A protein has these predicted regions:
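Non-catalytic alpha-helical scaffolds and adjoining flexible linkers that form interface surfaces
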Residues: 1-194
C-alpha cells in the first residue's frame, strides 16, 4: 500500500491518496489466518515504539502475511513472527546459556526457562518455571536465524512449549499482553488480570 500525505497541524496529516500494491486476499478464506494476522499486528504494535520506523520488522510482517496467504501453518507462522520480532527488537530470550551464571546447557538436552529472568536457567541457579525440550530449543534458535516461514506443522509438543514460553515472556515484559490487545480489539477485554 502506498499512502500519500501532506502535513497538517501538529501530529495530524492529511491523507491525499492510497493505492494497493499487494493484497493478501487468500488470508480472508480462513478465520484462523485472519485471527493470526490480527494477533501479529498486536505483537508488532506492542513491541515497536510509536513514531519509530522499523523497516526490518515491517519486512518480517510482510513475509508473515505472504506465508499466511500461501497457506503456511497458521500457528507456526505466528510463533515465528513473534520470535523474530523479539529478536529484531532486542527482546529475544537467552537460550544458549544460563542467564544467571552463564553455564551452557548440555547439547541435545531440555532446559528450564524463566521468562521473568529472560531465558534459560540452570538447576544450580534455581531452574525455571517451564521446560523447553531440546527440539523446541533447536527450533526456536533456527527460527531466529532464518527469514523463512514453515511449510509444515511442527510437532505438537514443540509448538506448545514455544507458545507457552512466548506467552510467559509476553506476560512478564509487555505492558499490555498480546492476548489482552486481541481481546480489546474484539470488545472482550476487561483489563489486566495479573
Amino acid at each position: 500500500m502506498n499512502a500519500h500525505f501532506r502535513p497538517g497541524r501538529g501530529e495530524l496529516a492529511h491523507l491525499e491518496r492510497v493505492s494497493v500494491d499487494r493484497s493478501f486476499h487468500e488470508i480472508l478464506r480462513s478465520l484462523e489466518a485472519i485471527g493470526a494476522a490480527g494477533a501479529a499486528l498486536a505483537v508488532i504494535r506492542e513491541r515497536v515504539p510509536d513514531h519509530e520506523p522499523e523497516p526490518v520488522v515491517f519486512d518480517v510482517a510482510v513475509r508473515f502475511l505472504t506465508a499466511l496467504n500461501e497457506g503456511a501453518p497458521v500457528e507456526e507462522a505466528l510463533l515465528c513472527l513473534q520470535i523474530r520480532a523479539l529478536a529484531l527488537l532486542g527482546f529475544a530470550p537467552t537460550l544458549d546459556r544460563c542467564v544467571q551464571c552463564g553455564k551452557m546447557p548440555a547439547p541435545g538436552r531440555s532446559a528450564s526457562f524463566d521468562a521473568a529472568r529472560g531465558g534459560i536457567v540452570c538447576r544450580a541457579c534455581g531452574g525455571g518455571r517451564l521446560i523447553l525440550s531440546a527440539g523446541a530449543l533447536r527450533r526456536w534458535v533456527a527460527v531466529q536465524a532464518t527469514a523463512e516461514f514453515p511449510e509444515q506443522p511442527w510437532p505438537d509438543g514443540e509448538r506448545q512449549e514455544i507458545h507457552d514460553a512466548l506467552a510467559h515472556l509476553d506476560a512478564h515484559h509487555a505492558t499490555v499482553s498480546v492476548r489482552e490487545r486481541t481481546s480489546a480489539a474484539s470488545g472482550r477485554w476487561e483489563g489486566r488480570s495479573s
